[in-house]
């Protein structure tokens, strides 16, 4: 990032989906940065330039006049901050595609909530492999794209290797209606974002199956315990789960029908079993199988996550999974 605080940082958001567009809009609206939204498709960039909107991703929302649009990797030249806002499973390919265009001094921030399915890598780990030498951060927490883009009050977390970098990122990306809290727990912040998607699917299953609000409350509370164990086992801070990137994001995603993960779970609950449709569209479907596999390798128990993974994979139906969860040995909370 720029060493001169009087110079507005250059920010490039890679990925013109709903969340990337929203982040670019809120950063541009703050008037404290030079912001470009980089789409991998020229027709999307051209539509945004021509109409001042991204109707494919955020219909009906006008974008700030100062926001730039591009489909060329050259837009990354001189960027101080690069936000990777594409889905988690596309991060490695994007890093390989754009890596040579990103300057050595740029700080790279992943804004996706997942893990790489094939390796179980956290996205910061993946980016560090593909883009060595860069400072790598993560932005996560409870924020729907439409809310952010509409200027509704939203608070999230940005984590980086040290607090100075995290604070710089928070100051550069925050605006009047968008507040970022700095953190150094990249592991905890990432896993909170990834695992809450799995638990949102579980809560959706409960809702779709008509199992009641008490069951949802149990899933949220016991799910937080699973998240805490997993974060600690992966080297993060267990207490991070109590903050915005853990509890905050879980409550939002597990209770709002804006959540794709919740809606996917509701469909599973209504059907009673997986039907092979929709799993490729939700981050939680990838995270469930990865987290269950890694938990086994780490020797930690994650029964809710394992049940969700088994339901999505078609190995269990909802009723059998519920019976197995409810018949587990009684232990102290």
Swiss-Prot record:
Cited HAMAP family: NAD_Glyc3P_dehydrog
Main location: cytoplasm
PROSITE patterns linked: NAD_G3PDH
One GO cellular component term noted in the UniProt record for this chain: cytosol
Organism annotation: Sinorhizobium fredii (strain NBRC 101917 / NGR234)
Location in the cell: Cytoplasm
Binding site for sn-glycerol 3-phosphate: 113, 141, 196, 249, 259-261
Gene Ontology MF term list: glycerol-3-phosphate dehydrogenase [NAD(P)+] activity; NAD binding
Record-given protein name: Glycerol-3-phosphate dehydrogenase [NAD(P)+]
Binding residues for NADPH: 19, 40-41, 113, 145, 260, 282-283
Class of enzymatic activity (EC top level): oxidoreductase
């Amino acid at each position: 990032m720029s060493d001169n605080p009087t110079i507005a940082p250059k920010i490039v958001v890679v990925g013109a989906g709903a969340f990337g567009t929203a982040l670019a809009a809120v950063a541009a609206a703050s008037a404290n940065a030079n912001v470009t939204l980089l789409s991998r498709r020229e027709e999307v960039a051209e539509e945004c330039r021509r109409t001042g909107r991204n109707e494919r991703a955020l219909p009906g929302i006008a974008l700030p006049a100062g926001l730039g649009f591009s489909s060329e990797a050259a837009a990354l030249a001189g960027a101080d901050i690069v936000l990777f806002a594409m889905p988690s499973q596309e991060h490695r390919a994007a890093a390989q595609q754009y890596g040579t265009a990103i300057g050595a001094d740029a700080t790279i921030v992943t804004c996706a909530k997942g893990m790489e399915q094939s390796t179980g890598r956290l996205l910061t780990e993946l980016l560090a492999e593909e883009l060595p030498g860069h400072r790598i951060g993560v932005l996560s927490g409870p924020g729907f794209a439409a809310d952010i883009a509409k200027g509704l009050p939203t608070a999230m977390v940005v984590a980086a290797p040290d607090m100075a970098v995290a604070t710089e990122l928070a100051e550069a990306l925050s605006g009047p209606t968008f507040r970022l809290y700095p953190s150094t727990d990249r592991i905890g912040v990432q896993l909170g974002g990834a695992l809450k998607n799995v638990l949102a699917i579980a809560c959706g299953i409960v809702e779709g199956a008509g199992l009641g609000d008490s069951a949802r409350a149990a899933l949220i509370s016991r799910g937080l315990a699973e998240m805490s164990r997993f974060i600690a086992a992966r080297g993060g801070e267990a207490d991070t789960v109590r903050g915005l990137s853990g509890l905050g994001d879980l409550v939002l995603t597990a209770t709002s029908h804006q959540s794709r993960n919740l809606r996917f779970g509701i469909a599973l609950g209504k059907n009673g079993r997986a039907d092979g449709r929709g799993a490729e569209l939700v981050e939680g479907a990838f995270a469930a199988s990865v987290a269950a596999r890694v938990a086994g390798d780490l020797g930690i128990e994650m029964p809710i996550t394992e049940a969700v993974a088994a339901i999505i994979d078609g190995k269990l139906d909802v009723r059998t999974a519920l019976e197995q969860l409810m018949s587990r040995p009684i232990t102290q909370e």
